[in-house]
Amino acid sequence: MRDVIVVGGGPVGILLAGLLAVRGLDVEVLERRAEPSRRSRAIGIHPPSMRALEELGLADAVVERAVRIRGGEVRCDGRALGRLTFREAAGQHPFVVSLPQYETEALLRARFDELSPGRYRSGVTVTDVRDRGDRVELEVEEAGTATVLEARYVVAADGARSVIRALAGIRGIKRGGGDTYLMSDYPAGEQAAEQAVLYFERGGVVESFPLPGGRRRWVAMTSSLQPDASSHDLAAIVESRTGVVLPSSGASVSAFSVQQRLAERLVSGRIVLVGDAAHQISPIGGQGMNLGWLDGLLLAPALALAIREPGTAASVLSDYDRRRRRSARMAARQAGFNMMMGRPATGLRLRLRNGLVRTLAVPPASAVLASAFTMRWL
């Protein structure tokens, strides 16, 4: 019987598994996918998340491979409304790290394999979960064979459509959303290599973030979900709103509709939720993966204590539930504000929005805003 089985081998699940392993726990990761994804997906690693990477000895390796985003600029109608620096808000790491998710996952998997060789299992599907009071049983299928695994605790890190959450009977409560976007990565062109740019334009927000290898991530709000859009369609939106002409690209485009949900509870007996299984947050603002990592930073020591001193389990896991649900609610409010600011605006609303941006971009408000955008409060 394992100490902990983590269901879901994405960036949140594998980071948590590493944090448990460095504490000496017997941990195993079950991942449904047979092969890792090669999509860039989440790219931003905020300063508080660097603490988790430091615990695993990965902070330097991540920073070496990444682009450091040291600040951002907000523009409208070809003019800068305000600039923001992360220098004062971010402490030891005065920047947001930009690295494609597949590279981050590869580093995490390699480190976990060093800590717990052979304990990352891919191509495994969970079909049932049963909390027996003193342990959890998982029914799984692997290569057509059904088996039962046991652990003292099971952690659901299996994403927004979490099978474990559903099997445990935990509801997800919707908290707004519905805005739609297109996203893709393009050759960088002439924009500053360490600066994010937000275009608060009349037709909706366009966002641009640097990536390693001379590329940039571009995101644009759309009036409806456009699942068949191409990179040329996104480039046309960017040019029409901002005047920026993107280089031709054959990269795939992601069309997504924002969903925000919070699980009614994060702990059910010996089953614990983390990441998108616990809270689904708008990706606008780059909070989702980081929020899950901060879950892991709190949950790893809590589970270690609960296993070694069982009498503390109810208290430490209740504290985890309370604190991380509170952080998720704060993140959802901030994500809602980010989306509201990026919606189409004309006339008085446009002038009021631009005025608010100018106000927030100067001290003392700028320091507060920088802390919020670098997730110092979560």
Q: Can you describe what each PLM-predicted range is?
A:
Residues M1-V4:
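Extreme N-terminal starter segment of soluble prokaryotic enzymes
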Residues G8-G18, V22, L108, A156, ...:
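Conserved mid-domain beta->alpha element of the FAD-binding
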Residues A21-R41:
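Glycine-rich FAD pyrophosphate-binding loop
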Residues A110, Y153, A157-V258:
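Conserved FAD-binding catalytic core of PHBH/FMO-like flavoproteins
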Residues S122-V136:
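A conserved short coil-to-beta-strand element within the FAD-binding core of flavoproteins
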Residues G144-Y153:
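Core beta-strand elements of the Rossmann-like FAD/NAD(P) dinucleotide-binding domain
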Residues S223, A302-L378:
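C-terminal helical "tail/cap" subdomain of flavin- and related membrane-associated enzymes
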